[in-house]
Every structure is written in C-alpha cells, then in structure tokens.
C-alpha cells in the first residue's frame, strides 16, 4: 500500500475485494467485513466487492469485472503487484500477442490437444511467440493477472493508467517464511492451519491491525475458513448428485463429472480428493474453482444470466474512510452503476449468486451466530473509518 501511494501520488485509494470465495477457488480466511476493516486500517479509502460471478473465475474474467468497477468509479490509475515489475513489458507483451494472434491461438490449441491445461498451453504459447527481454514471463500468476488488467483497460476503452510494483523475496506459491519479513498468502495460510498454529508466527509478516482482526474473528466465531472445514458438506452434496446434475454446474466440462464422482468415493479430506483429482489437463486452481461452484451450486445458467462478458452490474460498497466518503459525495452523479450500501431491497441475478455464496460460506459457523451473520450481510451498511483517529465509527 505504501509503495502504491508513493508510485501513483494518489488522492485516495480504492480496493476491489473478492467476497467469501477467492479467485484461487477457496474460501477467504475471514469474512469480507473483517477484511474490509483490515484494508481500511492499512490506508485504503474505499473498499468495494467484486461479485462471485467475477471473483471465482479465470484471470481474464476476474480482471474484466474489477476494471469495470474501477472504471465506473472514475479511477485514474491502477497499481498491481507483479513478478516482472516493469509496466512497459506488459504493454509490449500485449502488442506481440495481438500481432501474432493467429499463431498464438494455433499454438494454444496444439498444446491443449497434447493434454495440457489451458493455463499451461497459454504459457507455452507465449514462450514460443515472445523472445525479447522486454516481454513478461507469462508462467507467473501475478504477471498473468496484471496482463489481463491491462487488456481489460484497453478493451473497455478506459483512460485509466496502469502501474506495477515488483514482488520480491516471496513468490505467490511459496509455502515457507523467509527472513525478510515478507510472506506469501500461501505460506501464511499454511501456518495458520498447521498443527501447532499460532498468530505469533505470522505477526512479523502482516500489519498489526490485520493480525489483531484475524485473532478477533477466530475468537468471536470459533474458526478461520479453509476448504477442509467444508469437505463434509461438499462430499455429501456430491454423493447425492448424478453425472447429469454435475453437468449443469459451471466449469464442469469434458466428462470431468465422472472423474469427480469417482474420486470422491474414497477421499477422506479435501486435500486427498484434490490430489486424486488433478491431472496434467486440469490445474489445482481450475479444479478448486469447479469445486467451489459445486459447493455453492452455481450453475452454467446462473453465470449466463449474470452476463459476465459485460461489466459488473452494480458496486457493493463495503467500507470507506472519511476521504473515501468525500470522494463518493463529489462524484456520485458521474458514477453510472448503482452503488449498494446494503442489499436488502436490491435484486439482480449476480446478487442472487452472491447471496448463495454467503450462505454457504457461513454454514460452518455455529448457531445462533450463523443466522445472525446471514441477516447482517444483507442489511450491513458500509464500515466507516476515521483515518485521523484510526478508529472505526
């Protein structure tokens, strides 16, 4: 956050945040409301939600949804972390892909026909068409997402400028901590769910407010969220589904339903199920997203109705600082999308999916807290934060 503000000289900062389930196809550690508090305490001025229909998707769709929201909010610059760290290289790679589009598409098809996943086939195709050092490594996850952010900016004819900050010391999938007080999300999650987990172990790697809120959530609700806690629900659901039922679920393609129903029979944990399920053709992340759609019963028809090829249909406001509130007041007449401060009286196919996802997310919380959380989610007004006193209002 500090580097972003230094690089962009921004007046305010806006974060577009996933709801209960993430782009990797797994539940968020804590609720979006707690994560909103974390963001505000770390210097973000406006926190808005990326709907489930965009947030649990491949990088292209995820980026398209996020950029459409930022564009509607009249954001002038976007800043993202990447393994490359040079924004010119992203634009150059996009230019090369456009000029070599026919060759690129042929190579992707060729590598997929050889049994590779779409992600692997795309990465290999880029290796073949990119030769200059001024191109980015498209096998790296943050480079891929940044590439899609810029493509979305260009496709939406936005005047938004892009900046990138180089990630260092810790890579996206690193599972261990290093001695530079920088850790990946993967390593933090692994530590939190280890046998002798302790918040003390992760405190040097995250902001003080984040550590405090993580501990508070676990104390208040008795848990942090990960896939294993949903596995019994997930397995029960699959045991009651037919191949035909599964084929209606979003991202279940090419006979994957038969493999899923076969592997679930002997799996005793989500991790063992994923180990049995994964193949050269299907990446772990791709399969996790499919599993998320099974868990939330998100169908192909529902995603079709959400019209994800277009922009996000609304802006769900989760939190704001005083500066953020001032920005919205000054610009609300220019913002074309409806801004939702609660969802009790609003209806939309995309929001219907979000409500289901929230219900599933809180299913592991004990009653009566679970029902309270579900009711609050629809009526919850944006969290307000006074940045001068560092207190929530």
From Swiss-Prot:
It comes from the Bacteria. It holds the Pfam family HIGH_NTase1. InterPro entries: Rossmann-like_a/b/a_fold (IPR014729), tRNA(Met)_cyd_acetate_ligase (IPR008513). Its EC number is 6.3.4.-. The keyword tRNA processing applies. GO terms for molecular function: ATP binding; ligase activity, forming carbon-nitrogen bonds; tRNA binding. SUPFAM superfamilies: Nucleotidylyl transferase (SSF52374). HAMAP family: TmcAL. Catalyzes the formation of N(4)-acetylcytidine (ac(4)C) at the wobble position of elongator tRNA(Met), using acetate and ATP as substrates. First activates an acetate ion to form acetyladenylate (Ac-AMP) and then transfers the acetyl group to tRNA to form ac(4)C34. This is tRNA(Met) cytidine acetate ligase.
